[in-house]
Amino acid sequence: MSYPGYPPPAGGYPPAAPGGGPWGGAGYPPPSMPPIGLDNVANYAGQFNQDYLSGMAANMSGTFGGANVPNLYPGAPGGGYPPVPPGGFGQPPPAQQPVPPYGMYPPPGGNPPPGMPSYPAYPGAPVPGQPMPPTGQQPPGAYPGQPPMTYPGQSPMPPPGQQPVPSYPGYSGSSTITPAVPPAQFGNRGTITAASGFDPLRDAEVLRKAMKGFGTDEQAIIDCLGSRSNKQRQQILLSFKTAYGKDLIKDLKSELSGNFEKTILALMKTPVLFDVYEIKEAIKGAGTDEACLIEIFASRSNEHIRELSRAYKTEFQKTLEEAIRSDTSGHFQRLLISLSQGNRDESTNVDMSLVQRDVQELYAAGENRLGTDESKFNAILCSRSRAHLVAVFNEYQRMTGRDIEKSICREMSGDLEQGMLAVVKCLKNTPAFFAERLNKAMRGAGTKDRTLIRIMVSRSELDLLDIRAEYKRMYGKSLYHDITGDTSGDYRKILLKICGGND
């Protein structure tokens, strides 16, 4: 289909004759262009043809209201632009349907305008009335470069002589893809959820009665605080002080003791403030609880870590980084400082070319050299996104035949080894990482109660259901069973309440 005057004659449209052009001035293009530069800006007003404006205004005034549009450019032989329809441009031609108003376009896949053929159902689908193309032939209208269509779950075969791109779990063969690895989810797999019909004043009264007079009703405290979300427990704190003019935390400290008291007080802190005091406790005194620092920094979200850093400065008038530097050293210190920035990439897209480059750099920094370039491991493991690093770990296994965790164990030692392993395990499977930590806390003689309390409380509203499932899968026994056998008294009762059930 063509229009009168289009396409242009050979050689293009001729320039307008000098002088008297419909827009004023001496035609276009000008015989010479002014030089470009700052020295030319001052004279710009003088270079601009003022007649353009007057000519434009004169012609625009006659454009609307049904007036004829001037022939701005010489037309090709055989005619110029078609004449303006009667009534101006405001109305469609008699044979044309009016454009539907805003919001009234037919939905995708709907019926086309009258007289038009129906649309294909998808890119590459045959036009109605046309036969399907032969097998192996690109359907007309398909997007260029697309592989031939296959059934769901079937991979298209590459052209002859081309090797298929290796596949990864949850990844396709494109260079930039969105993997099937879900981002870390928070707040939807916990054993403790917000209680329905919550009344903070009523709960404050229950707690007041439980601690009033001779003796303490520990079971009432367990039933109340063990079945409220953290947000609801903060409201109970405020309501208790409003109703009785007393600090609930001080009353709990005076009435409770031991690990039961520690667990209840942990429940009463906000998640961020709880971590702040756990970190402070880990670096206090002569020794350092490196495992606690690793666990917190390797498993928390960017947002949580940034809030933690601000809260630490508020509570102790010292930055979190200063606290880390004062109590750690070497590459382990650098690892913790990197993680404490809360600056990990949160993208869910994966660039496979970057994945392969990172794999090569990790291999060159460790297995493929004498000694280890720890800084390269630090840079990649602390900054790349979770989705990207899962792809890196899979590709590392494929290219080297060795799991990344085993390479870390071969190349590093001590706290740095444990820190790097924790990062990898959290990225691969966070619930499994915590299931292992819980099992180690209860394994053998004695119980690491701080670790047990910290994990049970901090994960109770996040992913404790998933941790329970991983624990059963990894150790053949339920978490509930092992807590029952390793603790006692009210301490056991509150932990089992948080656990939420037997598997």
Swiss-Prot record:
Comp. bias (Pro residues): 80-117, 123-167
InterPro entries linked to this entry: Annexin, Annexin_repeat, Annexin_repeat_CS, Annexin_sf, ANX11
Keyword Repressor carried by entry: no
Major place of residence: cytoplasm
GO cellular component terms given for this protein: azurophil granule; collagen-containing extracellular matrix; cytoplasm; cytosol; melanosome; midbody; nuclear envelope; nucleoplasm
Key words, A-Z: Acetylation, Annexin, Calcium, Calcium/phospholipid-binding, Cell cycle, Cell division, Cytoplasm, Cytoskeleton, Nucleus, Repeat
GO-annotated biological processes: cytokinetic process; phagocytosis; response to calcium ion
Annexin repeats: 198-269, 270-341, 353-425, 429-500
Pfam families hit by this protein: Annexin (PF00191)
Subcellular location(s) of the protein: Cytoplasm; Melanosome; Nucleus envelope; Nucleus, Nucleoplasm
A GO molecular function held by the record: phosphatidylethanolamine binding
Modified residues (N6-acetyllysine): 246, 253, 477
Region entry Disordered, spans: 80-172
Binding partners and assembly: Interacts with S100A6. Interacts with PDCD6 in a calcium-dependent manner. Interacts with KIF23 during cytokinesis.
Domain-related comment: A pair of annexin repeats may form one binding site for calcium and phospholipid.
Described function: Required for midbody formation and completion of the terminal phase of cytokinesis. Binds specifically to calcyclin in a calcium-dependent manner.
Family listed: Belongs to the annexin family.
Protein name: Annexin A11
